[in-house]
Amino acid sequence: APTENIEGLRIGVASVRPETGEVVAMYGGADYLENQFNNATQMIGQAGSTFKPFALAAGLENDVTLATTFSGKNKTMVGTYEVVNYGDKSFGDRITLLKATQDSVNSAYVELANAVGLETVFNAAKRAGIPADAVGMEPNLAFTLGTTSPHVVDIAAAYATFASRGLQVAPSYIQSITTGSGDILYKLNPKPVQAFSTDIADTVNFALQKVVEVGTGKAAKALGRPVAGKTGTTNENKSALFAGYTPELSTAVMFVKDGPDGQPMSLSGTGGMRSVTGGSYPARIFTAYMKGALKDLPVQKFAGLPTGEPNGANPTDSPSASAVPTIAPVDPAAPVVTVMVPDVRRAKVADATAVLQGLGLSVVLELQPGADSTRQLYVLDQFPASTTAANSGSVVTLKVVNVLP
């Protein structure tokens, strides 16, 4: 844990056992006698990119694959929303969803949420276990970037849903209650619900393992056993998180900082770091804690990426930025239909969308700077270009403006 510039720092940690929902450990603060506030169950902070796996699961349920490509560019326009990537970094014109996950690319994830539907992503988060009444729980374009502020234990419980291959169980703090004479008054009886199919959960697990292996969560590699996870760092650095799990245990670590007035303040400078990211202190604390928590348990592996439907692609860690997006058909027995992408440049957006959807293609709009979505829109450019061969269900991105040059 940091030792420099820590005045006002709050750290919350919670661990949940997948399949049973048992909260087996939590850290709520250094001294309850000094501060009667549990950082694990009462503290809130914006979740940041730890919410991206819910959008990932929603996309996978709607025929998106880890090989589907989205914008990796900084300041991509999605509708009227300008999406800024962390550090103002661009990752390429088009990147696969797998790369967007491991590198936590905001532009790609907002495009994904817009394509599959904001309510769809919102409902996926609720199914995973994020409470519907969490602060800021509203389906908007920024939702997938973690503008919601759940409790630490909520995030640990939601990630436990992926660890248990899609089984969601409400977190529980009491295993049993027994009288002095030995009578059992209460015994935990978990009631798991299949929130996501095993294939969807296994694919999420595959992608989040890549976050640790080659992405923003590399600090957790030191755990030395299969682990999946996601970093979260928010605007103005007012919270930083790492949420991760093995098949046996799901744990979330959150940092927030209170200013002299009790209001959230930037973590900048904490521990001597210019910016405290989820991949820094939170991931290190996660790793150190999990080493101790799991030391006497045999190593378990995740199930692995499913073969065939719904996500048969096994993308590389460094895919081509110009790869044509592909989306698998719903019916595994149905053949993939290849179509030639038509030239819809200079067409009205409504007409272009009708043509593309008529060919079985999906459409994502990128509103260009200065364009007004309430007025007539025209297609300035498109990706992929015309005459490109694309599979049915592939995404075509249209750059749209009000006035053509």
Give the location of each predicted region.
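Solvent-exposed, polar/charged alpha-helical surfaces in well-ordered, non-transmembrane soluble domains
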Residues: E22-A25, N35, P53, A57, ...
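Mid-domain, small-residue-enriched loop/turn segments at the edges of structured enzyme/sensor domains
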Residues: E82-N85, G117-A157, Y173
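Solvent-exposed coil/turn segments that connect beta secondary-structure elements
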Residues: P18-T20, G28-Y32, E61-N62, K75, ...
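Conserved catalytic neighborhood of penicillin-recognizing serine enzymes
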Residues: E19, V64-V121, Q168, G180-Q209
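Ligand-recognition elements built from short beta-strands and adjacent flexible loops
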Residues: G224, P298-P405
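A penicillin-recognizing enzyme superfamily signal
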Residues: A1-N5, L9-R17, M26-G28, Y32-Q46, ...
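Active-site rim segments in enzyme catalytic domains, especially the processed small/beta chain
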Residues: N38, Q42-G79
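Sec-exported extracytoplasmic/periplasmic mature domains
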Residues: L56-V64, K75, Q102-N106, N114-L118, ...
